[in-house]
Amino acid sequence: FTSGSTGEPKGVITTHRMLCANQQSIVQCWPFLEDAPPRILDWLPWSHAFGANHNFNIVLRNGGSLYIDDGKPVPGLIEKTVANLREVSPTMYFNAPRGFDMLLPYLERDEQLAQSFFRQLDLIFYAGAALPQNLWDRLEAAAIRTRGERVRMVSSWGATETTCTCTSVHYTIEKAGVIGIPAPGVEVMLTPSASKMELRVRGPVVTPGYWKRPDLTEQAFDAEGFYKIGDAGRLDDPDDPAKGIVFDGRVAEDFKLLSGTWVHCGQVRLGVISACSPVVQDAVVTG
């Protein structure tokens, strides 16, 4: 079921084809998964699309090891995550930006923990929200200080209705905010919507519809069969689409001033956080 954060929760039909297509897409993005079984420490529940469809199935698909983290990035539980990371050196580490924000102070002051964390790490994966540039810079600095080189920093973009992954950053990038290029087997279309470009998705990872809600299913797809996800994006470099797409917030979150000027909330928020870092960790744009 979707989270229902902007409406009633909807049952998303998830097929075996979707799950298999998603994992095949991931392993084509990260071929090293077939060379060495992944080792993952994860706190996400399996009732969560990312926790199950992505993380659990990566381990299942590639014969890896999944260690269940009984901590999580909240006060009183982050300490359990830190203790677990002393015992388990992951090869892939997934978290939301808030999780890295809470973990970084421990990595920066505890050399033994940093050694355990970075020892065998192939990639750091952030998702769920935009990663502020100051957190990106601190993670890179911690990796270089600990192992003498950067660790690959990656992300992706998707939804419950798309199994998980629609776009993937599986190439080197120098800054936060890029959500990558369409994953293998996935088509992404940018469609004008008011002042933004709406992202629409088609491919074998997309749900056939909502459980017992043909009315909502019909509304969710356009005439060409693309799923209308409701997010907006723009090309990082209009002259070079291969550099990827930048997440541009929700289509409906922007507003217009009395002057007629559009306010792009997502861009303003990230700009404020970046300009005021490290004093400001988050910002809310209203109007």
Cite the ranges covered by each PLM segment.
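Gly/Ser/Thr-rich phosphate-binding loop
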Residues: N62-G64, V82, T91-F94, L104-V178, ...
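Short Gly/Pro-enriched turn/cap motifs at secondary-structure boundaries
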Residues: I173-P182, F221-G225
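Conserved G/P- and acidic residue-centered "switch" motifs that form tight phosphate/ATP-binding loops
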Residues: G4-S5, G63, G128, G158, ...
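C-terminal boundary motif of the adenylate-forming
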Residues: G230-A232, D236, A275-G287
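Conserved AMP-binding A3 loop
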Residues: F1-Q24
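Conserved AMP-binding/adenylation subdomain of ANL enzymes
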Residues: C20-R39, W46-Q115
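Conserved ATP-binding/catalytic segment of the ANL
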Residues: M197-L257
